């Protein structure tokens, strides 16, 4: 592999930009819905995001799991796995996306009710969920192709695809929500069309014949599918848990502060989604590098990549917290169409507490990706399940009972801090194995 420092910056810079772009799908909807529909639209969007997170999580699990195995096989020159893995992953993606598509056509309303939509928000939530579920095959195939193209030596093309999808979403959001007056439906259509354009950009990889992965005739292999799921499980848990946490927070906040509290949380959660994407960008950027180094047994380079990744994570955490702390008022005001003082107060206070979580999030996300990339899916799964479910759910109920809405804002910072302890242990344990 070429100079490891140059490779790190090549992959990580492209992926941070790309992931920020990808995360702006929902942030753009948040902004335009806030301005064009109002607080009920924000609430409806926030209620819809958990099902989006689950769908997106499955796509990332298959994409990251399949691409990680593909990259490791490239590193150790296992040509049989290289030939088969993409086809297995694509078939699995189409299976799951078909289920979501059918649910979008037949069950959007009951799903909305299950997610907490009430009389004021049911129609808006149903409109949004129905449209993006129908477009699930494009969302999931886009995730799959982004991961494989990145691991096939084209991180810049993956970045361009993600940014194209994001910018087109912003433009179409504006056109469909305002000039066309489609409101919630327009925002959903803009988001749904974005992965289609992203896939068109990714097709350049095949048109130029730069691809080393192909479709081939194979028998479905349960063993290979389970291997993909194991290596990608941490990505699934991160996405699914964020959806479950959002659903749980929505319900708790509804009881504490009503719809206006959920709207305020929607602002916080969607800004947090963009900030989290920076750490996801670092982790997904180092994944192909670490996987190939692991396949070649280049353990010294893996240590160097980890040092760079953690340094970048800490620097970004400090900078992002300072920016959101100092400018919290104008940031919240941008999403508050009616200048509601209650929404302003709840969201600004929440940002100051909630965003301390980023001091620890990067370490935990990068560690989970490092463990998956070095063929330690069990440890990555343990770390992710503690972040996503084991600690955060009881912590949310306990802290909200003790401190009200401030307890909600404290839940993730405390959870991520606790998870950092086993994360450091797993890193040290794995690196010691490399020294043997």
Predicted regions and their residues:
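Transmembrane helical elements of multi-pass membrane transporters/channels
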Residues: 10-29, 131, 142, 165, ...
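Small-residue-rich hydrophobic transmembrane alpha-helices
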Residues: 42-102, 139-158, 264-328, 361-380
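Helix-terminus/linker motif at the lipid-water interface of multi-pass membrane proteins
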Residues: 24-43, 112-119, 175-182, 243-270, ...
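Small-residue hotspots at the loop-to-helix junctions and early N-terminal turns
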Residues: 39-50, 125, 129, 188, ...
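Short alpha-helical transmembrane segments in multi-pass integral membrane proteins
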Residues: 1-15, 70-135, 179-233, 290-357, ...
